[in-house]
A protein has these predicted regions:
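Bacterial N-terminal signal peptides
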Residues: 12-20
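Acidic, polar-rich low-complexity tracts and alpha-helical solenoid repeat scaffolds
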Residues: 2-4, 19-144
Length: 144
């Protein structure tokens, strides 16, 4: 009985490992691809599935390529949000600021202003350290 349970656990572990390796291989293939539309769609899928690190890696490259196109605003906002959700708050605040300045009347501008403040707040250090990021977060909340 006990041996049977161990075999079952081992089988489950092997299947999970194979699936994880398959997903990683797919990401690597997409990342190396020159098909930007496919990369963009895959990045959106990663974002929807909560794979924000992969989404940020793909969108970071696509933001400059899509500048001036119909997908530019959405790709920049999704890139910033991917950084935020993967806890890279300093880079996220910069990306959200870029979103605000590049598209001042855009679809995501109001939300981007809010997330500038949130990113700065999240990156604030503990009270005994330099509070420049905290003051910047307070100002960003006031601007929002």
């Amino acid at each position: 009985m006990r041996k049977r349970q161990k075999m079952k656990n081992l089988t489950v572990c092997i299947l999970v490992s194979i699936l994880a390796a398959g997903c990683t291989n797919e990401f690597n293939a997409v990342y190396k691809s020159d098909n930007y539309e496919y990369k963009y769609e895959f990045a959106k899928q990663c974002f929807a599935r909560g794979k924000y690190t992969q989404s940020a890696a793909l969108l970071g490259e696509l933001v400059t390529i899509y500048k001036g196109t119909d997908n530019a605003e959405e790709s920049l906002y999704m890139y910033a949000m991917s950084l935020y959700r993967s806890s890279d708050f300093e880079a996220a605040s910069d990306a959200f600021r870029k979103c605000c300045t590049s598209y001042p009347k855009g679809t995501y501008t109001e939300s981007a202003y809010f997330y500038v403040a949130e990113s700065l707040y999240e990156s604030s250090p503990e009270p005994r350290l330099d509070q420049s990021p905290t003051l910047a977060a307070i100002k960003a909340y006031q601007d929002f």
